[in-house]
Amino acid sequence: QMSAGYDDKSPAMPVPGPMGPMGPRGPPGSPGASGPQGFTGPPGEPGEAGPSGAMGPRGPAGPPGKNGEDGESGKPGRGGERGPPGPQGARGFSGLDGAKGDSGPAGPKGESGAPGENGTPGAMGPRGNDGAAGAAGPPGPTGPAGPPGFPGGPGAKGDAGAQGGRGPEGPAGARGEPGNPGPAGAAGPSGNPGTDGAAGPKGTPGAAGVAGAPGFPGPRGPSGPQGAAGAPGPKGNTGEVGAPGAKGEAGAKGEAGAPGVQGPPGPSGEEGKRGARGEPGAAGARGGPGGRGFPGSDGPAGPKGATGERGAPGAVGPKGATGEPGRTGEPGLPGAKGMTGSPGSPGPDGKTGAAGPSGQDGRPGPPGPVGARGQPGVMGFPGPKGAAGEGGKPGERGVMGPTGAAGAPGKDGDVGAPGPSGPAGPAGERXXXGPAGAPGFQGLPGPGEQGLPGEAGATGPAGARGAPGALGPAGARGSPGSSGNDGAKGDAGAPGAPGAQGPPGLQGMPGERGAAGLPGLRGDRGDQGAKGADGAPGKDGPRGLTGPLGLPGPAGATGDKGEPGPAGPVGPGGARGAPGERGESGPPGPAGFAGPPGADGQPGAKGEAGDNGAKGDAGPPGAAGPTGAPGPQGPVGNTGPKGARGAAGPPGATGFPGAAGRVGPPGPSGNPGPPGPAGGTGKEGPKGNRGETGPAGRTGEVGAAGPPGPAGEKGSPGAEGATGSAGLPGPQVGLPGQRGERXXPGLPGPAGEPGKPGPSGPGGERGPPGPMGPPGLAGAPGEPGREGSPGNEGSAGRDGAAGPKGDRGESGPSGAPGAPGPPGAPGPVGPAGKNGDRGETGPAGPAGSAGPAGPRGPAGAPGLRGDKGESGEAGERGFTGMQGPPGPSGSSGEQGPAGAAGPAGPRGPAGSAGSPGKDGMSGLPGPTGPPGPRGGFDLGFLSQPQEKAPDPFRDRDLEVDSTLKSLSQQLEQLRSPDGTRSGEYWLDPDQGCTEDALKFTYSVLEDGCTSHTGTWGK
């Protein structure tokens, strides 16, 4: 068009001369009209990755990838609730380490991803401070009836109840042991007749003997029929905690709790191991058109045209009007890769990343100082049935718990112990009589006020004991009496030999939480727990270290185009690109006329920003950018190898009360209560067995002479008299004389031998009933009751209040270098150079050879926007986003079965002496001794003052008692040591070979503190 302009001014058409040399480059023309659309150029090199689009919706889960190797353990996270043990998974294969990819630029923050699945529970964190007490929860379901409690303390005496009906006749009691010798009884029946005495006067009747001591109380009669309901008694003390019930059925899954308060940031985890290299991601969607490339350098001069004929030089024409702008040139080829830019300034701190994975358990540290007293642990499973323990003292009254919500009705439990009397209800209609309940434990008698006077009772008991009569002679030694009450606790005896291990005791109440124990040896990894209940989302943790690239997730669906972000700061100018490839030769243009050199123009306005240069090499890692939104959940990895056993979780909430345990054996007898009021006269009991013959009574005073006895037998002939001197010879035999008179009786002969005892006389009248024997021994324990059926599910408890902020964790190790920061702001524009001086206009000379090219004219107005190029190839894959926040926990699985009982521990050292036991039962009577020599009888001792001789057996009894008590104390101290003795003990972790046992020393220091020190065994 320039040449056309000159033609218009020419007066004549000269013959064209040969083409002159190429003139200097003319100033840029004005923009030309838009040309027709050019052909689609070849695809450009991939442009730089554009800014990330908004996060698309979460794509479907991809197939599970292979597991990477276990990362190194992070610091303990906050304690998760301990799930029940799950089944043990198989060990997966270790993935290969991938090579580290180049760091991509940080993309803009995406929208928050969907919550990821729950992470595995972290190791138990340090114990937080006690939280404030939560609000009272809704009432829990009614638990099954607990076992009968121990007898409570004496209650206030209630009003006298109505007199119950007379109970049925009790069975005859067992035969009691002989009582102590009573005072002398009245004279026995007459003996066999003595030898005749002189008849004496009748003696006066003896004084009545002293009344015998009251007999022992009879055995307890069966319960009478139920009396009318008494007025409600005061509320009793809280019973002892029942034994844990059998495992309940799994409760229904509770609704997800409201999110808890954001927790404080957890401590930084340690850097995880490098993950395995991810598989290549799927090809991304085709990118948008790349930015316009820099203009290529000038192409080489075209081939020289044929030389035209030289024209006559024309006069210099005036400067033509600015031509229309030319068509937009084809996009130049992309420039070579620019030099690496200088690192940008560090970006702002990113959001706190998720806590890293748990680290492996470290070696056991040295014992820490004794921690604060922990909360009570979870109630254990019921232990085996132990021997009956001694009755404990009544505990202090517990705080009243909140009322629980009514649960679903449970299955019928065993008959419970009688509860306290309720207030009297309205009188119901008469119903059929129900079955009698099991008798409850005997309560301690309570002190009370005077009851209302009852109706006139039957004949009262025997009157007050009279003054003691004269002391009778010592009777035969009676059988040993029943054992007395425990004496006062004696001093501790010398330590006895260790006794055999006793049967396990009943499960005690949970003790207060002890001080923190020494770190145990590392146990085997527990089975994988089932998914825990949903936890409340925690607060953002502190920023974690940049994790290794995750496996690529499946491509998400294309998201909607995000709103345009605010313009970023201008990047620094890239280094000058290398010259582009040589362009194709353009067609030779017509020769322009050389214009005179124009004066230097003023500096042009600042040009528009050039197109983006090609992607530079990866710069050094910048400071970590802000945390991106969580990427989509990666596929589930293979199961890792079995990890170390985690630390014990914090104590769980107290479980529901267990089902009632079996009835334990009867406890020891309580101290005898004060005597109850006199009962009504019972029916006459059955005839008792005949009592043993009592000891001989005191000899009575000599009675008066009896009436004369019958005539004695004729005495034996007397001795022959001495021979008289011979008489005179009588007459011849005379006639027989008359019978003489009866002679007087002869002198009484000596007393005959006593006759043999006569046959036993008829049975005497029935004697008075003997004293009541002592109560019989406790019967054998009843058969255990059937196990109660489990109660219905309880309703889920409310979420507890958020705990207080935990203590600050220890600082983690220094993190790895962060990802590159965003580019720094461009440096300030340098000052413009000074304008050169304007040259003077020279005279117009003849057309010389072409002058040097003038300075480049100012840029033309921008051309119209070219057509959209084809999409560039997909850019390199960006970094995986940070892990999303943990999703809500799944419902808790059913509780696993209880583990098998562990092996028995090694036998402990002998404890100090136990307290002495109660007096033992009396032994059987010994065999009868040989008869002693027959003694005489001396009444002289009756006149001497009577004193009881020392009991030769008593000293030996005391010795046995003290030994028993000392042994009992030693056993008691073995069972529950009081922590006042220093000493050494061993712990064998696997209870097998003793080579790995640990020896500990327990020291009680002077200030009351204690210390544990441990040493390895061989």
UniProtKB/Swiss-Prot annotation:
Biased composition (Pro residues): 13-30, 138-151, 665-677, 819-829
Main location: secreted
Every Fibrillar collagen NC1 domain range: 932-1018
Biased composition regions of type Gly residues, renumbered to the chain: 152-170, 284-296, 568-577
Tree of life domain: Eukaryota
UniProt feature, compositional bias: Polar residues: 963-973
Location in the cell: Secreted, Extracellular space, Extracellular matrix
Any single biological process term in GO: extracellular matrix organization
A Pfam family annotated for this UniProt entry: Collagen
This protein's UniProt keywords: Collagen, Disulfide bond, Extracellular matrix, Secreted
UniProt protein name: Collagen, type I, alpha 1a
Species this protein is from: Epinephelus costae
Taxonomy of the source species: Eukaryota, Metazoa, Chordata, Craniata, Vertebrata
